[in-house]
């Protein structure tokens, strides 16, 4: 069986993950002056974000390509110990755990894909398919969507639009079936793993750009907490997760953050927001250490 055929068999399952994940980086864009000097391909990852609608609010979440661009630009070596152990999925017995770890494995798959780790990616895709089937969320996609992804797999712009549309399909499916909590948990798991990977890389390289990108997660974290808060009393698992994220948010209060708002351009049909605002972040080594410890503790609770 060819590798393309194998990936086609599993790719549909991961699509549920990739488009929902606030993977690794913040929504902040760069200045127009800096952007004009770059090619369209380089500009896309840092200026495209997706909109997640929750109740009557729209939350911008980073595009899946921001992390890939940053890590590739830095030529950071692959670390096989960063990703969550794949065998853990057999121990997830509740929908809460399955949804959170679906998000985590989706982020891990993105990390593996950066380094073209095809054998590992296939294994993670298999587990993701298993979990998504158990959660009953694979039904929101059809064959035409998978065919479109396959045809456009090397076109970042087209893929981002497809993923945004697929988010709309799954979001609608979860809402109709009164399962919005599952979507929020997938988002949470993906964000937690994203920040965990960034902190591991930031501490290992002491790269200032990466460390400051970690600091930029302050506002996405606030958004995530707001999305999860309605479920605080749904279960002890929810309240523990939210309390941990709130505790983490207090650590971000020590990050120096300035923000200059500029009107964004919004593509309502595809739920894409082009960020034009500018931000400046300074994160100390102390806050990097405290954030790293707290996000690792939250992650360990999720994957354990």
Where do the language-model regions lie?
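A cross-kingdom marker for long, charged
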Residues: 232-304
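Extended amphipathic alpha-helical interaction segments
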Residues: 155-242
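Bacterial N-terminal signal peptides that target proteins for export
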Residues: 2-14
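Bacterial signal peptide processing site
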Residues: 28-31
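N-terminal Sec/ER secretory leader and immediately downstream segment
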Residues: 36-148
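A structural signal for well-ordered alpha-helices, especially hydrophobic packing surfaces
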Residues: 106, 110-113, 132, 136, ...
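Short, charged, amphipathic alpha-helical segments
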Residues: 122-127, 144-147, 185-186, 211-215, ...
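C-terminal motif of bacterial Sec signal peptides marking the signal peptidase cleavage site
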Residues: 23-26
